[in-house]
Amino acid sequence: MSIGLIKLIYKRKGSKNNLSNFRPITMLNTDLKILAKILANKMKNVLPKIIVTNQAYGVRGRDIADIKSGIRDIISYLNETQKDGYVVNLDFEKAFDRVEHVFLFAILERFGFGKNVNEWIKILYNNVMTRVVCNGFLTEPFKITRSIRQGCPLSAQLYTLVAEPLCLMIKKDKSIQGIKIEEGKEEKKIFQYADDTTLILKDLESMKEVMRKVERYGKSTGARINEEKTVYMKFGRVPNLVGIFNFEEVKETKILGVTLGKDEKGARERMFEKLVGEMERRLIFWRGRFLSLKGKILVVNALMLSKMWYILTVSAIPRWVEVRIKRCVLDFVWEKKPPRVAYNTLIGQTDKGGMGLSDVELKKKSMRIKVVKKYIDDQEKGEWKDTMKYFLDKCGEVKLGDNVLWMKMKTWMFEKIPDFYKEVLKACFFFSLKG
């Protein structure tokens, strides 16, 4: 039961001759996966209570969008206030594969998991053997003394527990200064989703102290920073890190699949230009197929527009993108001929006689209303809520806070808030008219 098979999956970047550009996925025995899934379901119930940081990976009720939104808003805040600071995107080398089992078992005990749970997890991870599938052949079995198996149903919960100590060390150290949005509120210092770690630091001394913490954490867990892939953006008058750390300074970077940069509008434009180009090329491929109208709509919804929804949850969308996508979709559906069905019928619900085609503008507005719903829900603990309140207070410089969500506002009142929150307010007004 303890023997797994490792299959190497190419990451689709870098040379295939470099082994580090492959991701090891472990295929496990079905009995083991059933047992691991039972334990994972039990752990899901307690993780929200013991993971006190903003870590969202494998924690029930938390969303990756909260992490992306928090980082996006901090960048907007630093640009708007012109305050000093660093936004550092740490790259942990083979994060899951380097976790020491001794540390993993110690963490489980430290978090108070019972003896039975700990023993079952030790059965799953102690004295386990693995073989590698390579070119259709199997290597000889070898013993695994470290790593959290990617492919194990428990991997998300276990790695979240392993990552928590680093986040706690950074958050609790008062010598490490983050960015404070409002007096009386906690400083924003670190955002985590699995091993994707983004630091928000005020000065160089804080950066040095964080790296000391990371080094100490690595000695215990086996974690190691890949300095060549770690990048940072600096804001205000903070010094460059060249000669201090082997990190690359960038104007923009991709964080959790979304491009964020100092030039927020420019980074967004380039991200959508690339995305829309990929969508158009994908539809060219499908044009040669003999598809029915329903088949074409399925292709558009499932293979084209679905790629945009992930980004749209946290990024404002330029108007030209909406226009270009709509034109591209209609050209594909009607084969560049005059439409035979009204657009409102195309996007209408199928149970009401429509065709169910997704509409980018309506989807955007519904996503923005979801943001409002999470914002006014006291059970939601996303750190972006502090920055959203800050930007809502900027509307008209009258500090009306949440009240602006229910008001009809003049265009000039939007000028000092990020484009994303402009879309939020416009969506509120749109649905208030519908109501």
Give residue spans per PLM region.
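Conserved pre-catalytic core of RNA-dependent polymerases
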Residues: 1-165, 169, 329
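Residues immediately flanking
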Residues: 11-12, 30-31, 41-43, 90-92, ...
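Catalytic palm subdomain of template-directed nucleic-acid polymerases
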Residues: 94-111, 147, 190-219, 236, ...
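Short, conserved micro-motifs composed of acidic
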Residues: 136-138, 224-253, 271
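Active-site nucleotide-donor binding segment shared across nucleotidyl transfer reactions
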Residues: 173-192
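Basic, alpha-helical interaction scaffolds
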Residues: 194, 245-317, 334-338, 366-383
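Short amphipathic alpha-helical coiled-coil/interface segments
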Residues: 322-333
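Extended C-terminal regions of large enzymes
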Residues: 325, 338-435
